[in-house]
């Protein structure tokens, strides 16, 4: 069996997550190719997407081992800053909002009730017309519902712990590949709060 193979892309270097099909590759000209990582997904809150883009930009500027060490330090700083801002309630509701599309009418969700559906039902209770195809914006809050539509939310209700978990899941894939432990960074962030 003879097959012709072509080179599709040449990476200066790549960072692989432990999960399949999740990686970040830096092309020769510095562009960064991100595949399957949480920080790139549409429904990730804007605050985390922005921090993820900062991280990607820093990795795109690596040309040497010294640059790589500097990028690791910057990434650690980016994650610590996000963590601190979450703890201090410095993000706006818009920065924390998830936006997920309703793929079917509300009444068609029978077995499970995803978070965006819970938020959509709260909007409907307030008199809003909700249809399949609509993007539902919500934030994670303390309390039994666990979510609140963005329009009804108050910054004091935000469940900071849930957002810390989201921060971890967004960055941990890349941090692991870079040899950085998430809990280590958070330990530094907590110690820094004393100074």
Residue ranges and their predicted role:
Residues 1-195:
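DNA-dependent DNA polymerase catalytic subunits
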């Amino acid at each position: 069996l003879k097959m012709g193979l072509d080179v599709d892309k040449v990476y200066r270097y790549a960072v692989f997550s432990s999960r399949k099909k999740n990686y970040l590759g830096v092309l020769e000209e510095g562009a960064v190719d991100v595949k399957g990582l949480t920080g790139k997904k549409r429904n990730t809150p804007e605050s985390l997407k922005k921090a993820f883009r900062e991280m990607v930009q820093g990795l795109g500027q690596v040309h040497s081992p010294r640059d790589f060490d500097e990028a690791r330090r910057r990434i650690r700083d980016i994650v610590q800053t996000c963590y601190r801002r979450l703890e201090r309630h410095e993000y706006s509701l818009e920065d924390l909002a998830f936006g997920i599309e309703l793929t079917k009418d509300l009444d068609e969700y029978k077995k499970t009730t995803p978070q965006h559906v819970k938020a959509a039902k709260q909007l409907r209770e307030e008199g809003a017309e909700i249809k399949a195809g609509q993007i539902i914006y919500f934030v994670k809050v303390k309390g039994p519902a666990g979510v609140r539509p963005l329009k009804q939310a108050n910054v004091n209700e935000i469940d900071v712990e849930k957002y810390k978990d989201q921060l971890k899941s967004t960055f941990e894939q890349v941090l692991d590949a870079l040899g950085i432990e998430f809990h280590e960074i958070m330990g530094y962030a907590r110690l820094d709060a004393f100074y």
